[in-house]
């Protein structure tokens, strides 16, 4: 019951309630993650307690921003093993979640999780971020683009902002020290049609971890030249 209590507390902290049914979905998800991780490299975090805190609770804390409660559509860019997209879909079944990843094996895992958990509000797409943003049905189509991928804000902005509708939001789940990174990404955010709105600190229950939600509002259309071709985004970030 320790994990259930921890997750309930985390959910309450962001104005949500975790039902037993939702908790059971998280446990099935955890078991699948551990099982698949033995054959596909999904995560370096493999212990029960670490998965609960560093993956599940960390993802649930995104709901500290009301945008995650109010949005109808969300894309999780470079979702990997499904964070934060799948936890968001479990906690809010009214949001349509698109999971985007460049590795087909991970997409197969995500499809299995979606099926086993009975998530009707999730679809997984196999694509690089740069390529997906050129598709008409995906470009500037989402209320929220989010990412917990390990890349700096300049790179993430070019990966994510092209997916966001005007007046929608790009919300990055980042680590504890983001000030310098934000400063360096100012030009990228502006160039891509965004405006920095807020940096929101979150704490992870029963740990000393502190993370940040970096919130960028999409205020104008993203120029058609972005995102650039695969490789250019990471090699030559907009500065």
Curated annotation (Swiss-Prot):
**Which range is the signal sequence, renumbered to this chain?**
none
Keywords (A to Z) from UniProt: Cytoplasm, Methyltransferase, rRNA processing, S-adenosyl-L-methionine, Transferase
Q: Do you know which InterPro entries this protein is assigned to? A: rRNA_ssu_MeTfrase_G, SAM-dependent_MTases_sf
Q: Which GO terms describe its molecular function?
A: rRNA (guanine-N7-)-methyltransferase activity
What highest taxon heads this organism's lineage? Bacteria
Q: Its Enzyme Commission number?
A: 2.1.1.-
Concerning HAMAP family, the annotation shows:
16SrRNA_methyltr_G (MF_00074)
- Indicate the family of this protein: Belongs to the methyltransferase superfamily. RNA methyltransferase RsmG family.
Role played: Specifically methylates the N7 position of a guanine in 16S rRNA.
Known NCBIfam families for this protein?
rsmG_gidB
Supply the name of the protein: Ribosomal RNA small subunit methyltransferase G
Q: Which organism is it from?
A: Clostridium botulinum (strain Alaska E43 / Type E3)
